[in-house]
From Swiss-Prot:
Protein name per UniProt: Probable Fe(2+)-trafficking protein
Sorted UniProt keywords: Iron
Family: Belongs to the Fe(2+)-trafficking protein family.
Function in brief: Could be a mediator in iron transactions between iron acquisition and iron-requiring processes, such as synthesis and/or repair of Fe-S clusters in biosynthetic enzymes.
GO CC list: cytosol
Source superkingdom: Bacteria
Keyword Cell membrane (UniProt): no
Gene Ontology biological-process entries: cellular response to oxidative stress
PANTHER family: FE(2+)-TRAFFICKING PROTEIN-RELATED
Length: 87
């Protein structure tokens, strides 16, 4: 499997086997983010969708997730919703 130096975890890890999004952001994620970080984002994204009851048909919800994804993957910011508690 191909390796990348992951911007989130600051180490060389397995790459995502595909470009997860179209466009420049998708290329950036594919080239700079590991599969481990991408899987962590998918889990975090699920929390955000459920806790904020996001409707993914709405452009505003999609933009919110895109901003949160960038913060999570490239800026190291992983803020969970205030009302969220892990069981």
């Amino acid at each position: 499997m191909t390796k990348v130096f992951c911007k989130k975890y600051h180490q060389e890890l397995d790459a995502i086997p595909f470009q997860p999004l179209p466009g420049e952001l998708g290329k950036k994620i594919h080239n700079e983010i590991s599969n481990k970080a991408w899987q962590a984002w998918l889990a975090h994204q699920t929390i955000l969708i459920n806790e904020y009851r996001l409707n993914l048909i709405e452009p505003k919800a999609k933009e919110f997730l895109k901003e949160e994804m960038y913060k999570f993957l490239f800026e190291g910011k992983e803020e969970k919703p205030e009302q969220f508690s892990e069981i």
